[in-house]
Amino acid sequence: MSGPQYGAQPGGYYNNNNNYPPPPPNSYQMNPMPTDGNYGQQPQYGYGGGPPPQQYGNGYGDGGYAPPQGPPPNGSKPPPTDGYGGPPPSYDEVFKVQKPKYNDWWAGLLFLATVAGFVAVSAISIHGYADNRSQNNGSLNGQRNTFGLTTHTIYLFVWVLICAIVLSYAYMWMARKFTKQFIYATGILNIVMGLVTALYMLSRKYWSGGIVFLIFVVLQALFFWSCRSRIPFSTLMLQTAIDVSKVHGHVYLVSAVGGVIGTLFAAYWAITLVAVYVKFEPDPNNAACRNAGGCSSGKVIGLIVFITFAGYWISEWLKNTIHTTVAGIYGSWYFNSRNYPTKVTRGALKRSLTYSFGSISLGSLFIAIINLIRQLAQAAQQNAAQEGDILGTILWCIFGCLIGILDWLVEFINRYAFCHIALYGKAYFAAAKDTWKMVKDRGIDALINECLIGPVLTFGATFVAYACGLIAYLYMVYTKPAYNDGGGFTPVVVAFAFLIGLQVCNVFTTPLTSGIDTIFVAMAWDPEVLMRDHPDLYHRMVQVYPHVQEAIHA
């Protein structure tokens, strides 16, 4: 009796009673693979019900092979494997959506409304800042303004942006040139930089900032030490992602364009932040308060919260759009490496900005809300520390850790859901559910947990954020602006400098994480493609992590 075919898995996993798409159909006849003496066991079979093919010969699509078993349910058509015997197909043909529609459109409209609101607040605030520019200039440290942020702060954020761009670019360059040493260097440099920043702040008796940075350093050091055994497998996955990106140069083009857009937005956001303080900060010396609308602390707090939320959402949307676009490139490489499609980058970007725009906006919204809550918790923790409230500081620290765990969980789901969205064009919740179910059932979650690239790149982004925060702190200490005579604005400026550095670096490094995430998701869809079309990668994975055979054949 022949084994089960795609679309008729045991237990009805891929039948029409659920929403899970089958792995991409293989357009070749399944032949048994002999026992590999290197691994000492018979090959395990995947979701297809049969073993991977014995040979890697071409001639696909000549009519002598078993046809695919039909499209998956719910209008999602899996990508066909290498189609030989004709011109390369386009991205839209390979990853065709049967019934395309604008998924999660309401989230897309809400995102556009938030962008419009941010632009409106920015325009009003910058106009008020421009009308009173003479009061906010005076000199580098803005001596004419003693009540709020000034042009001095814009100069500061310019240096922060320069630092973020240079370090992010250098970090990406180091990943390409020194891949094997990259993970060790990232962990060590991040810990050292965080420790230096914490000790310097403590030496200046800036207790709240120093304690927070010191806690981060201790947690990162413990994590890095406990994960030493996972570095070889992580290095292999990073090398694979970089090797593919070198062949398909659009990966770095997307990264460069995204980095430029992210930097420009960060500059625009920083100017808006300063302008809000100038326009609405209540003070008898603030000329802007004499105009219509007036000033109040409530307006300042409300607008700062709104532009912070909008900044998180817009930057997350940009990062996830890059992620979804790059996922299309790596998905095309995995499933069609021998007949790479045309217009891949264009097709993936088009889908991200049209049918999947709402889904990307929705996933980004969750992260933006969580990040905003964490930012508010950090501000409350710093305020409690400044007031000497030890219990409050500890409680806010615990709350921040819980929010951090929630952030990690949602980010984890988003990364793989967006890979599914890039290739299948499904709605956010359906993609998240289907992808996680498939990854879990395949055992790929074990490989994901074994790979450190996500945490390592987060370490790198944190290193850049540390540097930006340190520059902001030094700038505030040595230029001594009049508005910061009592040091009250130092935590605010340092926190936002940290945020800018973190988000800019995350945009630059997104293509690397996208590539690795897509490879994992593609392996869950069809591990036989890995063994047939990428045997060298499969054998190297087995060498550094022997349990990979059990994981991908679960």
Curated annotation (Swiss-Prot):
Cellular location(s): Cell membrane
PANTHER family: CHOLINE TRANSPORTER-LIKE (SLC FAMILY 44) (PTHR12385), PROTEIN PNS1 (PTHR12385:SF4)
Bias kind Pro residues: ranges: 68-90
Cytoplasmic topological domain residue ranges: 1-105, 175-181, 228-255, 319-352, 411-451, 509-554
Membrane topology (UniProt): Multi-pass membrane protein
Pfam families: Choline_transpo
Region (Disordered): 1-90
Family according to the record: Belongs to the CTL (choline transporter-like) family.
Domain of life of the organism encoding this protein: Eukaryota
GO cellular component, one term: plasma membrane
Low complexity: compositionally biased ranges: 1-19, 27-45
Glycosylation sites: N132, N137
UniProt GO MF annotations: transmembrane transporter activity
Stretches in topological domain Extracellular: 127-153, 203-206, 277-297, 374-389, 473-487
UniProt name for this protein: Protein PNS1
Protein's job: Probably involved in transport through the plasma membrane.
Spans traversing the lipid bilayer: 106-126, 154-174, 182-202, 207-227, 256-276, 298-318, 353-373, 390-410, 452-472, 488-508
Keyword vocabulary terms for this entry: Cell membrane, Glycoprotein, Membrane, Transmembrane, Transmembrane helix, Transport
BP GO terms, sorted: transmembrane transport
InterPro entries, per database record: Choline_transptr-like
